[in-house]
Amino acid sequence: MAFEALLEEQREETRLIIEELLEDGSDPDALYTIEHHLSCNNFDSLEKAAVDAFKLGYEVTEPEELELEDGTTVMCVDILSEGALKAELIDAQVEQLVNLVAKYNVDYDGWGTYFEDPNAQDDDEDDGEAIDEDDNGIRH
């Protein structure tokens, strides 16, 4: 898929995910963990992309093997960030990561997050983390 077509598809998917979460009652003001999914059949390439993402300030999960429907195996990692559930912020991260992984022939497989209950008791309300209104989504 061409670069611009992939980004446009991801922008549409981002808006759909956000819309569905909010329609289901997820807290619009919560701090969300965004999990960007990467995969590759070459571990070394995936590792290089993961290291570059880490250098940009993202958290990176341990690599895992995943068997696909056709029986082939790929290696996967999640690239994590925290922020507001705002399409523009997520779009910026997606574009940054798609550009990054293209250098290593790694697949960007989309992103996801979790429902945030607006009525849940927050055990770590005093942890000092707040949504940064000036965050443009891009990590440095």
Curated annotation (Swiss-Prot):
* Listed GO MF terms: endoribonuclease inhibitor activity; enzyme binding
Outline the segment boundaries, as ranges, of region: Disordered: 115-140
List keywords of the entry alphabetically: Cytoplasm
Q: Where in the cell is it found?
A: Cytoplasm
Q: Which GO terms describe its cellular component?
A: cytoplasm
Q: How does it assemble?
A: Interacts with the C-terminal region of Rne.
Q: Which family does it belong to?
A: Belongs to the RraB family.
What name does this protein carry? Regulator of ribonuclease activity B
Gene from which the chain derives: rraB
